């Protein structure tokens, strides 16, 4: 619903309409939180009998996974922000219609999360991670070089990228939680924070990249993803993950 509603508001009232709507929603949510008494859920305090390793910020596996999360969502939001410009300039598709084209992206992300639940019962996390990185890197490169070729090809590429994005959060969260069982709340908070930074930076950076340089922009991202894939494939990562 959000892409369709956003495109409708944008087509009629431009960015002022969109941000005014978001402001109203934010005020309503604030009032709900302020006036409605939400009971606190207290979790039992677990006494740890073993020393907890909290040096996660220097842990190579954690840094690798967080960097991967950053890159995935950096790329995804770069595509989301670039897509309206691409559709308008290359395919002559207006803002109102382009919002409808965002709906399959949302669906693909949901499908990705459902696929992960099924895959996780049959395959281990590292195997799923390798396949996901490979697919995302390959289709990121294809998006960079084929985004102006055909709207059908573009739609297929974006759909597959969205599916990979749907798999990533649950997959990385599972791996991180298993590695840092006793402090998973803290490390997942860091992971999500970095992920959101990736979204913001990706959305901002693509805005200053001229259209002729888009292919090289996404090629650079692909190279970084390949480097992470190669690191994950070596035994050192496997041993550290199994620690």
Pin down the residues of each PLM region.
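Helix-to-loop junctions at the C-terminal end of transmembrane segments
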Residues: 10, 112-125, 210
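Helix-loop-helix hairpin linking two adjacent transmembrane segments in secondary transporters
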Residues: 1-34
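C-terminal membrane-cytosol helix-exit motif in multi-pass small-molecule transporters
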Residues: 23-43, 229-235
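A late C-terminal transmembrane helix in Major Facilitator Superfamily
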Residues: 178-213
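C-terminal transmembrane helical hairpin of 12-TM major facilitator-type secondary transporters
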Residues: 126-172
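Juxtamembrane intracellular "pre-TM" segments in multi-pass secondary transporters
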Residues: 37-68
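Extracytoplasmic gate region of multi-pass secondary transporters
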Residues: 61-103
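Small-residue (Gly/Pro/Ala) motifs that create kinks and tight helix-helix packing interfaces
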Residues: 1-10, 84, 201-210
């Amino acid at each position: 619903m959000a892409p369709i509603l956003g495109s409708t508001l944008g087509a009629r009232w431009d960015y002022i309409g969109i941000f005014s709507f978001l402001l109203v929603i934010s005020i309503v949510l604030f009032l709900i939180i302020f006036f409605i008494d939400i009971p606190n859920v207290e979790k039992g305090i677990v006494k740890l009998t073993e020393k907890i390793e909290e040096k996660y910020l220097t842990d190579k596996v954690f840094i690798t996974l967080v960097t991967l999360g950053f890159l995935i969502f950096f790329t995804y939001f770069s595509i989301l922000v670039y897509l309206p410009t691409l559709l308008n300039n290359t395919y002559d598709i207006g803002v109102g219609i382009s919002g409808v084209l965002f709906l399959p992206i949302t669906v693909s992300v949901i499908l990705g999360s459902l696929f992960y639940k099924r895959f996780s019962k049959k395959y281990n996390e590292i195997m799923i991670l390798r396949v996901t990185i490979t697919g995302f890197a390959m289709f990121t490169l294809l998006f960079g070089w084929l985004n102006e070729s055909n709207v059908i090809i573009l739609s297929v590429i974006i759909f597959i990228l969205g599916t990979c994005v749907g798999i990533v959060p649950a997959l990385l969260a599972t791996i991180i939680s298993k590695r840092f069982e006793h402090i998973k709340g803290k490390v997942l908070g860091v992971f999500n924070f970095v992920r959101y930074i990736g979204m913001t930076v990706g959305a901002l950076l693509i805005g200053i990249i001229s259209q002729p340089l888009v292919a090289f922009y996404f090629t650079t991202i692909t190279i970084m993803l390949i480097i992470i894939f190669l690191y994950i494939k070596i035994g050192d990562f496997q041993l550290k993950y199994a620690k």
